[in-house]
Amino acid sequence: MPKYVMLSSLGPDGFARLRENPERLREVSTEVEAMGVTVLDQFAVLGQWDFLNIIEAPDDVTMAKVATTLASRGTLKTMTLPIIAIDDFIAGMRG
């Protein structure tokens, strides 16, 4: 199944919600998984982006649904990148 990196950056409203309820991060993961994907790992990061998630989804369309649903809430912006395992990448370069 394809994997993706989703980077997210919270806006002021997103930070306010997070300060009120830090467990909201886990709640959002549960909501995201209800859309048909699996959150494999989640990290807080420093810099331009606030969070990095590794997500497995059946296809690009499902992942686009997740990204647009989250962005439509107005509390964050996202960037989603498809990722390829290095072994698969090397095999593709050879083949």
What function would you assign to each model-found segment?
Residues 43-46, 55:
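Structured beta->alpha junctions
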Residues 57-84:
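An amphipathic, aromatic/His-enriched active-site/gating alpha helix that lines ligand/cofactor pockets
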Residues 9, 54-56:
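Short hydrophobic/aromatic beta-strand micro-patches
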Residues 39-42, 78-80:
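Generic structural signal for residues in well-ordered beta-strands
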Residues 1-34, 38, 45-49, 84-95:
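Short S/T/G/P-rich N-terminal loop/turn motif that feeds into the first structured element of a domain
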